[in-house]
Amino acid sequence: MAASALGRMCGAAREKLSPGPGARGLGALARSLVLALLLVPVLCSDRSENPPNNATVSSPVVVTAPGNHTSPSVSQISTTLSPASAEKSGSSSAAPTPTAAPSAPEEEADSNEDPSMEEEDLLALNSSPATGKDTLDNGDYGEPDYDWTTNPRDEEPEDINIAISKESRRFRGFQDSVEVVKLPPPNREDSHFFFHLLIFAFCAAVVYVTYHNKRKIFLLVQSRKWRDGLCSKTVEYHRLDQNVNEAMPSLKITNDYIF
């Protein structure tokens, strides 16, 4: 796109400056300067992106001296620019391929080395237990001798075990006491309960009757005492009794009376 635009501008300038020889020299110089100014940013960008391509692009674009009023043609510019663009596209498209290519040989090398490495590892593992046994037999661990003195921290688990054993004994004793105290069957419990209920009801009835008839009971007991102890059954007593009954006939109705 830049080459076509530059070609169009150069053709228009050539047509305008064609009338005189002096004008042709000035026009050629002006065109060379304009082309140089236009191509400077393009060349800078090309150098930053692809340094090897700068030599190919910068070689044809050479500004001639003021004495020689010649400048490169548009065809040369287009031909010099097109390989650069082609090389850019080719480099961009071919850039990922070199990264993918070395991976395959590395994988093949890994696959070729894996069996041998695995065999070596297996041999090392098979040979390592023997050395471990030898070191265990010899007792040389590369460490100082173990101090067999008792440590208070080491005694803590024993205290814990003693406490646990005591708790287990207490729990077993509690279980034994619970097993000893067994409740009777439900039928026996019901029968005993009914029997106790009858006894309690009888006692309550006796207390109730005696409380409400306490005066009568007291009079009955006292009258018997008077008759048995104090009042003798003599002739005088019978006469007095007859006289009282005759004088008070209403006393015959009641037997309980006090003299």
Swiss-Prot record:
The modification Phosphoserine is found at residues 165, 223, 250. Residues 82-104 have a biased composition (Low complexity). GO terms for cellular component: membrane. Residues 47-155 are annotated as: Disordered. Residues 45-190 are extracellular. Glycans are attached at residues 54, 68. The keyword ATP-binding does not apply. Keywords: Glycoprotein, Membrane, Phosphoprotein, Signal, Transmembrane, Transmembrane helix. InterPro entries: KCT2. Its main location: membrane. It is a single-pass type I membrane protein. Residues 50-81 have a biased composition (Polar residues). The keyword Transmembrane applies. The chain crosses the membrane at residues 191-211. Residues 105-122 have a biased composition (Acidic residues). Residues 212-259 are cytoplasmic. Residues 1-44 form the signal peptide. It is found in: Membrane. This is Keratinocyte-associated transmembrane protein 2. It comes from Mus musculus (Mouse).
